[in-house]
Amino acid sequence: KKMKLRIIDLHTPTRNMNENFPDKVHPNVNGAVVLATEVYKVLTGRNIAHEIQSFPGFKSEWNGFDRYDYEYNGRQTIVVEPHIPLPGKPWIWRPAFFGAFASADEMLLERGFHVVYYDLTHDYGAPEAVNLGTKFYESMLHYYKLSPKVTLEGLSRGGFMVLNWAIHNVDKVACIYVDAPVCDLFSWPGEARKDMWRDVLNKWNLAEQEMVYFKGNPIDNLLPLAKAKLPIILVCGDSDKTVPYMENGKILYDRYTSMGGPIELILKENCDHHPHSLEDPTVIVDYILKNQP
């Protein structure tokens, strides 16, 4: 009162709007719009047109679909929304390389999937990254009502991340699509890539000498996925010089098969690490669609 500060009455505009305050305290989306509109009007003296977005952040367009960019727990987040979502709101999440070799993503959008990116690119599937991914997953269910069974997509190092996340969250996964995936950190980045290797040690909070006992590679921990019969589709080039197939995808395929896990392999002849995916991704998309809950 002494400072003659303006008081904005938000009670009167929201009176008799019980449906917009489900817990009688916190507003839902419509209630938040009413509050924001009233505050804006008092501060500026103007009314303003508004749009209720499906997701937070900056809205733009990606390949003809609505795209939303925002941060969650300090990490870049992108959600691309289908024109007509399928019942249950299925979604595919990749933690690395948004928009790269995205033919399968584009076809899934056309079929009614949400395409989601949450950036864990440079975390090497470490425990903290797995925890961040789980918190992000929970936010997508709680706030946006996406399906509790997510499809995971991992290209290259992203494959390491999605496999490790799935191992710790088997009940949350519909199926996995991995493409030229890193499955063994000793193969890629390997000790020869010294800067990246130091980064691996930092992310995993390990000393060099402790790596002798390292058991964090997904190919050493596939049993929970196999027991759950979690479907995996694996796309690889047989001439991959960056993430060698024989040291990564082949071991994943052989071990998962030996455990009775369902896995489909598409091995591209004379293909290096790039290009990822397939020119016609129908076989990938059909596999994902048939393995939804």
Please give the residue ranges for each predicted region:
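C-terminal catalytic histidine-bearing segment of alpha/beta-hydrolase fold enzymes
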Residues: 80, 242, 246-293
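Glycine-rich nucleophile elbow surrounding the catalytic serine of serine-hydrolase chemistry
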Residues: 154-164
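The feature captures the conserved acid-bearing segment of alpha/beta-hydrolase catalytic domains
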Residues: 198-250, 254-257
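Hydrolase active-site cap/lid region
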Residues: 164-210
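Catalytic His-Asp segment of secreted/periplasmic serine-dependent ester chemistry enzymes
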Residues: 1-48
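Alpha/beta-hydrolase active-site loop
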Residues: 124-145
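A domain-start/cap signature at the N-terminus of enzymes
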Residues: 48-87, 195-199
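Alpha/beta-hydrolase fold nucleophile elbow
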Residues: 144-156
